[in-house]
From Swiss-Prot:
Pfam families: TIM (PF00121). Keywords: Cytoplasm, Gluconeogenesis, Glycolysis, Isomerase. One of its GO terms (biological process) is glycerol catabolic process. Gene3D superfamilies: Aldolase class I. SUPFAM superfamilies: Triosephosphate isomerase (TIM) (SSF51351). It is found in: Cytoplasm. Homodimer. This is Triosephosphate isomerase. The active site is at residues 96, 169. Pathway: Carbohydrate biosynthesis; gluconeogenesis; Carbohydrate degradation; glycolysis; D-glyceraldehyde 3-phosphate from glycerone phosphate: step 1/1. GO terms for molecular function: triose-phosphate isomerase activity.
Length: 250
């Protein structure tokens, strides 16, 4: 299975800046190693530009940071899977903790998005993760199981495993500079793999589980070498081509 090296650019970069960084990234990486794939989630307004920069370049893909589970309609401010596909993007991100906490998205709604995207031909990275209070309160497995079971509730049992990835992002490690220890990461990813075997047994062992949370060039190699870590989802360190290329090639 290829490691999925993903970047979430959040609400940064104009279309022009996104195109420039995407082009710089292609040059900095050169040929993507056979065991890697690169996936960038720019803001909506930069999707077409990043897709164009990656067009015809093996191993580079882009996706949307959000999606609405309908083909079209009176949903002001929202974007449909078809609109995303029309830009040249192939992926969508669902369940990110910032959308759960800041915008109040429930796990049930995340599940609707995930299932609808897969039905409409978009691949999905589904994010899960606990707060520090939940971890310290012994709620880690309960929280992750709830997010996974609802997030995957509409996913068909026969889903092709390469079309769906899980990103485990401990909320307390996102943008804080705090990183879960390698033992913590490995243990939690093993728990997630076990849950996937219960929920999607046919696909579970071939699905990629990414780690996210203050991933940087100097810790990426140690993280992606762990059992059940099949890539990373990178925030701040992905905004510059130089640093993200080092993570991709770590």
């Amino acid at each position: 299975m290829k490691k999925l090296m993903a970047a979430n650019w959040k609400m940064y970069k104009t279309p022009q800046e996104a195109a420039l960084t995407a082009g710089e990234l292609v040059k900095a990486v050169g040929t993507v190693p056979d065991d890697r794939e690169v996936l960038v989630f720019p803001p909506f307004v930069g999707l077409a530009q990043v897709a164009q920069a990656f067009s015809g370049v093996a191993g580079f893909y882009c996706g949307a940071q959000n999606v609405y589970p309908a083909d079209e309609g009176a949903y002001t401010g929202e974007i449909s899977p078809g609109m995303i596909v029309s830009t040249g993007a192939a992926w969508a991100l669902t369940g990110h903790s910032e959308r759960r906490s800041v915008l109040g998205e429930s796990s049930a709604f995340v599940g609707q998005k995930t299932a609808f995207c897969l039905e409409k031909g978009l691949n999905v990275v589904l994010c899960i993760g606990e707060t520090l209070e939940e971890r310290e309160g012994g709620q880690l497995e309960k929280v992750l199981r709830g997010q996974l079971s609802e997030g995957l509730s509409g996913v068909p049992a026969g889903i092709a495993p390469e079309r769906l990835a899980i990103a485990y992002e401990p909320v307390w490690a996102i943008g804080t500079g705090k990183v879960a220890g390698t033992a913590e990461i490995a243990a939690t990813h093993a728990v997630v793999r076990g849950m996937l075997r219960e929920l999607l047994p046919a696909a579970a062992d071939s699905m990629r589980i990414l780690y996210g949370g203050s991933v940087k060039p100097d810790n990426a190699a140690a993280i992606i070498s762990l059992d059940n870590v099949d890539g990373v989802l990178v925030g701040g360190a992905s905004l510059q081509a130089e640093s993200f290329s080092r993570i991709i090639l770590a």
